[in-house]
Amino acid sequence: MGAKTFEGGDNHEDATNALSTKSNAVGGKPRGANMLEDGDGEFGTDDDDDGDGQDSSLAVVNPEDGSKPKKRKRSKKKKSNKKKPGDGAQQQTSPPRVPLSQLFPDGKYPVGQMVKVPAVNLRRTTDEELRYLSRGTITNDEALSDYRKAAEVHRQVRHWVHETVHPGQSLTELAVGIEDGVRALLGHQGLEPGDSLKGGMGFPTGLALNNCAAHYTPNPGQKDIILKKEDVMKVDFGVHVNGWIVDSAFTVTFDPVYDNLLAAVKDATNTGLKCAGVDARVGEIGGYIQEAMESYEVEINGKVHPVKAIRNITGHDILPYRIHGGKQVPFIKSKDQTKMEEGEVFAIETFGTTGKGYMMDGPGVYGYSKDPDARNMHLPLASARALLKTINQNFGTIPFCRRYLDRLGLEKYLLGMNSLISHGIVHMYPPLVDIPGSYTAQFEHTILIKSSGNEIISRGDDY
């Protein structure tokens, strides 16, 4: 979920974090292919990983003398009862409805892609590292397990999206399907007060089409949109467990004409992930992202368009129950000297466009979120007080949308919502759009910054 900023803004609030399936994505490459090209990471290598759950490549070997192999009597193959790590008695369904607790009864969830960092100044112990170490390991291990669980939910749900999304599908059907899958896999339907704070959506499912880059979700009262073959759709959704939010996004197309646009954005996101690390400066990362992104062009309807990095939305750090922390990672080079620190979690995302590269507020409302710094104050409207109580009990500072309020059975809440917005208690998010006729794409991953090696928590087979 992109954070909107102003072009050229170099001053950002500094915040320190408390945490110091196989699918075919359109325009993407298998995870193994990326490892061969990148050469800088290993998927699923960690002290907690069993290490034998990955696919291996098989080569056909002919006899050295060139003779035909001798015929042998075939023996019946015995079915292997060996299960991969994390396999439970059940397999995931389509749509996904089997809770992860049944698929991973031991509570050990897959590790993300472990990325080695250069061995620079290993004897240095910074204040940030001391703060991280002083927090102890038990809480951190629990939080990391929650993160990995949220990431596995994201992977399994988006696998279903890759397998089933098609032209002619309504965006409401797709959004509800994603959210129903997340809630089912976590075992939290979120219909009782406090339940969705234990686990659920990290923010409303974003399904932005074409020139709309981000912050669109189908809501009550809007005309339902039907997906078309020529559409470019950004699928951006978050999953949280106990407030630890995994934020990851990808782009779906049905026409290969957009392949270069998707390749540019995927390359830019992977570049940002490679550059992330302890002491990395966000302004410099933005420069590398921009260089990768803008080395591409795409031909659409006989016209060649340079792919531009969008200037006024950014990646961001993630705090407990807060999808946008105080740090931002731009997609363009800037003078921002803000550093990444040990134990921080970032959403490294990039947006590319064939348009102007500058986002404007579009019509309508995507969703809302409570300001974490909102002061307690008297609200004159009873409807506003009742709505705020519902928000505190069900969402806290996690973003939500009108569909979620309707799902809880709320009615006639818009007057109370407007009161909360006018008092600065709740923020409203509009869709973010480029010029009409342009096309935008997005890819995003959640990464944990560690001096011993970063973990791309949300990495999967698809992207």
Curated annotation (Swiss-Prot):
Subcellular localization: Cytoplasm
Keywords, in A-Z order: Aminopeptidase, Cytoplasm, Hydrolase, Metal-binding, Protease
Cofactor entry: Co(2+); Zn(2+); Mn(2+); Fe(2+)
GO process annotations (BP): proteolysis
UniProt catalytic activity: Release of N-terminal amino acids, preferentially methionine, from peptides and arylamides
Residues where a divalent metal cation 1 binds: D236, D247, E444
Annotated TM spans: none
Residues annotated as binding substrate: H215, H324
Basic residues bias: start-end ranges: 69-83
SUPFAM superfamilies referenced in this protein's UniProt entry, alphabetically: Creatinase/aminopeptidase, Winged helix' DNA-binding domain
Chain intervals with Acidic residues compositional bias: 37-53
Region (Disordered): 1-107
Family to which this protein belongs: Belongs to the peptidase M24A family. Methionine aminopeptidase eukaryotic type 2 subfamily.
HAMAP family hit by this protein: MetAP_2_euk (MF_03175)
Name of the protein: Methionine aminopeptidase 2-2
Organism listed in the record: Talaromyces marneffei (strain ATCC 18224 / CBS 334.59 / QM 7333) (Penicillium marneffei)
